[in-house]
C-alpha cells in the first residue's frame, strides 16, 4: 500500500552510554529518524548538508545555533537551513524526531552521535 505507520514513543531503548538513533521511516522524499537522549547527553556541534526539521516528541533540549541557545520543549518544531552549525544538550530524557532530506545520509547522523 501507499501508507506506512510507525511510533516514535514505543519500543524506547535509551542508553546511559550514548544517544540512540534509528531510522523509523523512509519515504520518497525524506528520512525520519528517532534520536533518544538521556538527560545530560550532548550532540556536539555539527552541520547538515541539506535542510533539516527537528521535532520535539518528548522532553526538552538546549538547541545551540551559531552560538545562540534556543530552549526546545515537547511539541516544538524547528527548521534549519543547510550548513548551519548546531548542537543539542538534553535537559531531560528526550525523544527527537529528525527529518532529513532523502539526499542526506543517516550514516552522517550516526557519525555525529559516535563523535559526541
Across the structure, where does each feature detected by a protein language model lie?
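A short, N-terminal "cap"/entry segment at the start of jelly-roll beta-barrel domains
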Residues: 1-29, 112-116
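Conserved short histidine dyad/triad with adjacent acidic residue
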Residues: 18, 31-48
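Short beta-strand His + acidic residue motifs that chelate non-heme Fe in jelly-roll/DSBH
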Residues: 43-45, 63-64, 80, 85-91
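A cytosolic small-molecule/anion-sensing beta-strand core signal
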Residues: 57-58, 73-74, 92
Amino acid at each position: 500500500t501507499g501508507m506506512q505507520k510507525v511510533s516514535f514513543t514505543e519500543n524506547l531503548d535509551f542508553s546511559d552510554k550514548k544517544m540512540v538513533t534509528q531510522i523509523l521511516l523512509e519515504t520518497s522524499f525524506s528520512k525520519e529518524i528517532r534520536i533518544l537522549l538521556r538527560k545530560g547527553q550532548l550532540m556536539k556541534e555539527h552541520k547538515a548538508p541539506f535542510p533539516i526539521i527537528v521535532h520535539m516528541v518528548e522532553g526538552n533540549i538546549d538547541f545551540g545555533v551559531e552560538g545562540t541557545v534556543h530552549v526546545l520543549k515537547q511539541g516544538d518544531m524547528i527548521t534549519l537551513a543547510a550548513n548551519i552549525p548546531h548542537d543539542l544538550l538534553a535537559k531531560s530524557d528526550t525523544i527527537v524526531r529528525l527529518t532529513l532530506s532523502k539526499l542526506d545520509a543517516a550514516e552522517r547522523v550516526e557519525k555525529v552521535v559516535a563523535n559526541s
